[in-house]
């Protein structure tokens, strides 16, 4: 630790600057890296959790005749491997989804998570996870079929909305509809099923998540032009 300068006013016309010496560290103080670091170093590579088939962020593609993880989140995983080992290949990708991402991180299946995860106070405190600096700023979005004929989410009164029990979208949707005095019909997607697939199968009028996630999802639709992001 370094010393700091403390200013103590004496009267209205003068100030005395006192140099405060740093206090000695407590006896037995020995800062160390956490268990995750030790595990990674012993293993020799980083296990990074990321989503599959998430265009622009993380997906496996054929690059120069070999399968390679590409996208923003996948590149962050690769950057961590370079920072730790100086080798971008010192990485193993583990596929996660909205329900398994925290479970895998907590039980040690993965060392780090890079998978479009909203930073919230409750997640930071309750799950006892260390969030790294934010890498992407986004907001809540909604996706609907173009045939619905709406141009604003405020026109979705009475809509059937698919959501999963995990993630922040459920509460975001609830808050949005309450704020604008709109009713909706919730359609909860069972564990193991995809909200996106429920929507494609016509089981709801819309679903919501981060706007970037919706753009990525729509890119993979058979007819992306038939869907609108609000």
Predicted regions span which residues?
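Acidic, polar ligand-binding/catalytic clefts
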Residues: 55, 78, 82, 86-155, ...
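Solvent-exposed, acidic/flexible segments
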Residues: 30-33, 66-77, 94-98, 135-136, ...
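Short helix-initiation/N-cap motifs at beta->coil->alpha
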Residues: 33, 90-103, 148, 184-201
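N-terminal hydrophobic or amphipathic helices and topogenic motifs
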Residues: 1-92
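Ligand-binding cleft/hinge of the Venus flytrap
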Residues: 61-66, 78-89, 131, 169-190, ...
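Second-shell loop/turn segments in exported
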Residues: 59-70, 90-91, 101-102, 158-163, ...
């Amino acid at each position: 630790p370094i010393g700091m300068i403390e200013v103590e006013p004496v009267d209205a016309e003068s100030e005395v600057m006192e140099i405060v010496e740093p206090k000695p560290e407590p006896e037995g103080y020995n800062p160390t890296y956490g268990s995750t670091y030790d595990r990674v170093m012993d293993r020799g590579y980083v296990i990074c959790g990321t989503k599959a088939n998430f265009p622009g962020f993380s997906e496996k593609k054929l690059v120069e005749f070999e399968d390679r993880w590409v996208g923003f989140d996948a590149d962050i995983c690769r950057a961590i491997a370079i920072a730790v080992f100086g080798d971008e290949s010192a990485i193993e990708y583990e596929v996660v989804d909205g329900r398994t991402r925290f479970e895998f991180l907590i039980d040690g299946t993965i060392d780090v998570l890079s998978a479009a995860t909203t930073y919230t106070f409750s997640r930071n405190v309750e799950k006892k996870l260390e969030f790294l600096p934010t890498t992407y700023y986004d907001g809540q979005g909604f996706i609907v079929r173009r045939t619905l004929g709406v141009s604003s989410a405020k026109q979705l009164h009475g809509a059937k909305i698919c959501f999963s029990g995990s993630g922040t979208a459920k509460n975001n949707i609830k808050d949005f509809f309450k704020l604008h005095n709109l009713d909706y019909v919730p359609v909860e997607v069972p564990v193991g099923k995809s909200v996106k697939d429920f929507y494609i199968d016509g089981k709801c009028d819309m679903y919501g998540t981060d706007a970037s996630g919706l753009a990525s999802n729509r890119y993979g639709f058979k007819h992306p032009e038939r869907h609108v992001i609000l």
